[in-house]
């Protein structure tokens, strides 16, 4: 598949590739304003899915934390077993903490910059990926918007008004 460069950079397509994490130090947040301007000029709606990327690849969430989440009970046992093996394999040798933190920081800054510029954001969670359960995971996604600096009111718009506007 030549649609993206396997292992060349940390992007949504390559984040699960360990070698790609070596590119995080090269991420340049000074490029965010130009990217935001291009997105705004194109009239694009953006669905960051930050919680999926953070919880799956950037945050080392322990087994007890996962198992104590209220949504964990709604994941079928067979899926839990399969996904747990994949997750454990990924986290056996985690990317460096500094890289994971920088990745999260830049995504949060970009999310905030997009919102501040008036780019319509839409909340999405990529549920049912990994351990994301419909309903619960959208609340987690909204929390990432608020932690990025977006007001709770505007975070809620990303799950209500903005998708309505997008769909017409």
Each predicted region: which residue ranges?
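Active-site neighborhoods of metal-dependent hydrolases
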Residues: 3-144, 148
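Mid-to-C-terminal alpha-helical segments outside catalytic/metal-binding sites
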Residues: 151-165
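Short, solvent-exposed loop/turn segments at secondary-structure junctions
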Residues: 131, 165-166
